[in-house]
């Protein structure tokens, strides 16, 4: 996925009220960005470091600028826009990058499923194979060299694991796909120290037949895309 038009840069001052961040531009002026990330952003906030943001020409938006990337102190990059994970996953599936998810005839987004009033991120269907239900999660938390999910207690994430297990019990294929938007994460594990119930459910889901995949993103201020698989430690 290319960033069009090109991203602009500034220096992070602060994130506040969950969905807002103040940034200083090169001329010394300050602007407020929309922060499109519902998580805690634990270990992803570095005041004084460079951020990259997009700008919308939609006059109805209260905040025209959206925070896209964060530069880490060691010059790494973090994808802040967690909502892009689904788009990145769809793009990678369509291009055949995720080898485990090839060979289907159609791809649908946000389809109702399960018994807890949920919508699946991606549904793959093919004439010669079971339907494949894919839940996509953005992984950005790095601690002691290990990537973790979630970065806060996630009741919604727990619900999605139950739904995936339900789909397996109905004879379908179910996949949890971690989209790793941190250049220094090379393996993903459940954050049992943050959400022990999620970690327990994930182990249960794997035993029930839910597949878990993780793919790293290659990121730059001009584009971002899924590139290669990484290790999952359940």
UniProtKB/Swiss-Prot annotation:
Protein name, entry field: Sugar fermentation stimulation protein homolog
Family recorded in the similarity comment: Belongs to the SfsA family.
Pfam families: SfsA, SfsA_N
GO MF terms, alphabetically ordered: DNA binding
NCBIfam families xrefs: sfsA
